[in-house]
Amino acid sequence: MILNGPGISYTEPDIGAEFVPPLPEHPREAIVKLCEHCTNRLLHRDELLGYEYWSFAEAATDEQAEVLCKMKMRRPYTLPEMVKLTGMPEADIEKMLDDMSYTGLLEYNWENPERAKQWVLPMLVPGSAEFLNMRVSQLEEHPVYAKFFEQASKGPLSKATPMVPPGGAGIGMHVIPVEKAIDAASTSVPIEHIEHWLDKYDGKYAASTCSCRASRRVMGEGCADDPADWCIAVGDMADYVVETDRGHYVTRDEVYDILRQAEDNGFVHQITNIDGENKIFAICNCNVNVCYALRTSQLFNTPNLSRSAYVAKVEKDKCVACGRCVEVCPAGAAKLGQKLCSKKAGGQVPEYPRQELPDATKWDHTKWSPNYRNDNRIETHESGTAPCKTACPAHVAVQGYLKLAAQGRYDEALALIKRENPLPAICGRVCNRRCEDACTRGRVDAAVAIDEVKKFIAQRDLDAATRYVPPVVTPTRAGGFDQKIAIIGAGPAGLSCAFYLAEKGYRPVVFEKNEHPGGMLTYGIPSFKLQKDVIEAEVEVIRLMGAEFRYGVEVGRDVTLDELRAQGFKAFYVAIGCQGGRLAGIPGEDAVDVTVAVDFLREVNSGKIDTLSGRTIVVGGGNVAIDVARNACRLGSEHVEMFCLESEVQMPASEEERREAVEDGAHISCGWGPKEIHLDEAGRVCGITFKRCTRVFDDEGRFAPEYDENDLRRVDADRVVMSIGQSIVWGDLLAGSKVELGRGQGALADPQTYQTAEPDIFVGGDVYTGPSFAIDAIAAGHEAAVSIHRFVQPGSTLTIGRNQRRYTALDRDDVVLEGYDNASREVAHVDREREKAAPFSEYVETFTEEQVRAETARCLGCGASIVDPNKCIGCGLCTTKCAFDAIHLDRDRPECSTMVKYEQKLPSLGKYALKRAIKIKFGKK
């Protein structure tokens, strides 16, 4: 053999190489022979690979290796036969066999008429490579086993994959669909049902560690799942894994619970596929981000290595592009597209490309997908999908919850919203409605009143009897995770992060320096827009999910990060928002009657200011300035006027916000910048002078105001509120940390993971982006929860295989909109009498049920899921997520249920390879 042969990476990262030492100058001869004996010879390799050598060298003594070399692979031997084969005393050989079984070099069963115990030298995969990885303590002591498994499940297949026929040719594993996805399929055969195999091995089940999850975790590419108890050994294999400390017996009900939890998490059911149609020895529940069996089809783009006899199909009329099937699809077969007709497609719904297959095409590494774990998570086709879902920073399934609301399924609608937005009642009142700006219906008449429908749905959260508390969906069989996570700041980003961590099975602790949660939602937004009981109700849901809230605690002052680390906290999410304001740097601004907007709003919302007299001047033109002006009007200020640099067209505040401010009595003067604040003899504000702003931005669009110093305007004032920007007040929070700060003192972090230069500190919301909207912070908190979950689970990658969140909107100029009737947009009733009686209470009413029905009927239903049958592996997970009965499995590929024994592999490959060669030669499809 050639020594120091290379590992095979196939353009994937060569992970785990650090666990493979250089081959010794004089390798152990017995181990070299064992490598030759056990290695799959399909490649006809003659090199000695380091990961093979060191794995066998650490697993076997020379004497054990010599015994193994005398055994034929997959041929069972009874104890008398092993005595005869080796010439060893019975007691000695039995102990050696049991020792090698415990290590994982051998397996055993009782598959003979006498039910005598017999030992088997298994193939590498599935076989000894898994067994070596299934006991965590052993794997941690011998991490080279992880590299061995990773390579042994890939390298031998590289040349064979295009020749694998439907059914898999006795190689590896085979997808078996979710039972309820095919339970009504009259054409199904028994081996396609999990129930068939559970019946066959009734009473003999054991739950064991997932070797793929364990292997990837050791090499730093774990998926953050707890590896324990996801794989179900059946029959004699159940006894083997229990007796060798790889698992424990479980009842049939416990098996059902494992299967249900696997489906909830989006794990694919697979069965072993090396013993023909009359035997399996395991049912695995696989995460495509780590599973080596699923990798065989996904890396090489050869689905025959995995797929079942079934293909998912979408009923477009029922589909609402909610994206649930897309998120869960392990093969990237389901993607979001459109169902509106396209001008470019000749007035028809566009057709979508299909994955090329090796059946009639020459296949080499250029056809592979080394980045499949990320590529399979791309959510939309390039041509785009529903603009509402795309435009929403949290990518809420707008089209989906509109349809559920139209059907009166309000609980399900609320559940769907909360998959991406845990604060829908809040957002129904204060969101800046980018979904409506993007709504295709706006090209017909007016955008659908999406936010008003969401507000109606989310009203259920305000009542303990109807609120929706999501169930915990956790990738651990232990019921949840015990790692302690601290969230600093109970604003929208922190609340969102707490919600999604709790949903994942954590019990995060939220530290809030104020006495109430919500951050700027509570202390910044006027109560006539957002009642505080709405915030409390949605926070209560998060508390019921398992989050703990500690109020009146300022991290950095009352407790430090290091002290929290000493208390066992493993990660921190810093989301303290922009709590300070900025001044203009002009004379007189240090007077007592000059304040910044965030301080003014905080005092109003805390009840410290309950009346105002005199004249109030607000400097600034954004939505926060509008809030200040409207509060001042309602508090009784005699004259309220806003001054901003921008023209009316350029003003950051929305047109709706400006209109409401004027209705409240505020005046708006555009094109003015502050020059000087005037004080009387007592040092109190008596006026302010403005100078004409002639230009706000330079030619590159950068903020660079220019003024006409000769065009001045002085106005009387009793107080001035500066609303020209916000600042971050860090205090001593980051003292001693490695967190780096950038422009405006914002924290620097990775744009996808939000991890800072201090690995256990993640940031989000306004401390990362600067002042933004609640929905942006909510989206950031969700992504941070994903990152933190991965961070605190040992050996997990923060990036590989996470949903990309790269949604693309369809081209609204391309869709055919002729033929749609105009339908007036519903408008929420404004109760002016209530507003007069209680100016700081909400006065905009929620839609009625009739209005919801009318408004949801206006949705054009732009998007739909598209399934590529060439990529679909028929797992059926998509069917478990769809709330609209819009996606089903059809038995289009019955030949994929052809299960043959491993020993028939070469004839099966040869027969199919001949057919394929003929197709390639003659160009047949």
Model regions and ranges:
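Beta1-alpha1 glycine-rich phosphate/pyrophosphate-binding loop at the start
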Residues: 396-399, 405-406, 447-451, 487-555, ...
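Ferredoxin-type iron-sulfur electron-transfer modules and their immediate structural context
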Residues: 33-35, 56-57, 196-199, 203-320, ...
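Glycine-rich dinucleotide-binding loop and its adjacent helix/turn
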Residues: 457-478, 504, 537-557, 581-635, ...
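Short amphipathic alpha-helical interaction segments
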Residues: 86-102
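A Rossmann-like FAD-binding core segment of flavoenzymes
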Residues: 533-582, 595-612, 634-744
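A short, conserved structural fragment
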Residues: 101-112, 334-335, 887
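Short, amphipathic alpha-helical interaction segments positioned at domain boundaries
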Residues: 115-154
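Short acidic, hydrophobic short linear motifs in intrinsically disordered regions
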Residues: 74-86
